[in-house]
């Protein structure tokens, strides 16, 4: 059902393409009444899918109460189905925007006045957000967790004016008191309530002091016009990739019309070029928008509902989307140039992976390394206010996977922030940090056989070889583009021969077949590039690292959207990992 819901956007786009092509006199097009096409388009827009996904999930989870239930039981299945329906509805496109408050209410959550909810609410609806509380991006509010035999479900309560830092986890049963503050990257277990005015940090979180007054005590003016501004902006963000795809598709149709070839064969032949055109168009749009929004952007505290607050939010959303749709551009030699062109100050020999930041506020010195999923700069929320500030990463410093360097942080040279850790406000040169709140970690010197030419200062020959391998990453979006063309071609055959109704019913089957093919291609690339992974150390400038990044691009760009997104929480993902026993795999779930 969830896959069929996802396929509706494909059918709607196909019907629109057919109507436009039919009006232009193209022979292979079939006209569908505009009333039906309009209804389909409204249904598959972010807002339309939001209503369907929200109320469908609420219907599935109606009557579920806090408690522990068998993993193989009905409650688990209902929650899993609600998650899949919500995912298919495209709820992520409205995260951090005005619409997410309405989506939370549609799920059954209680959302007070002046709440700034910049993350996804739980499908269970067991969430209570009191007036003027703030929840920053990527906070886990799912309200349940799964072990070997049970699913544990609980409520989450966030008090008035409370602040929940980015990438924190609130476990079932969490109670956050009024004016309390949970720092970024923390995990609140729910075993002990967070009292009013307290500041908690860590994983598991514990009290570290009193809540700091980083924002004005009184909320800013309501400014209702910005509610509409945020809402329209989220719709624009959802439509921007489609506009880029439309440019690529138009070039493909023009190619087919210019030569004497069967339309379907011509579209498949033109798919690689059309994909690259769409990829480039989206990149140019992202670059132009970020540069425009960064003009005269100043750090400091500003109302969320203001030009400054909106611009900071918009830029971070664009950067977050870019690392998904422009994934081949990241963790590459071109990545520092990309961030530099967006307005960040980036030194020489810098390595940047899938990092999210407000470029105008970030300085990265020579030889530094930002690993996967790092959050550099960003913003903090509190009582309707937003704080954005400059962040500096010192020379030859390292921020580990999913590390956080918040606004107004400075990491000294030759320093390290460990995986899933936060950066201190100030640090001494040569210091190591881990955890949240960050604590000093003893530095251990490791001797390796790798030379500077394979770590920090590669020779020209190595740069050329790496560039050649990284260029091959474009094969991943091209493969995804060919799959998309094949899906549309198959749906077109169904539309011409069996009609719109049958096409809608079989759309999910077509997507499942495409997902299976995407998985097969990705697995093949994995074995061709790196074979079986074995424990060991490899210098950054080595064939193994380059080829591993190449196969990972296929995982993220081909397998993830076509297969993994539709099979979360099932036994298919562990099976993809080619573990030795199918009997063992049947007991595993990856979400």
Regions found by a protein language model. Name each.
Residues 104-106, 110-202, 206-207, 339-340, ...:
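Structural signal for interior beta-strand "rungs" in well-ordered beta-sheet cores
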Residues 1-108, 196-342, 428-577:
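Terminal amphipathic alpha-helical/low-complexity segments used for targeting or macromolecular assembly
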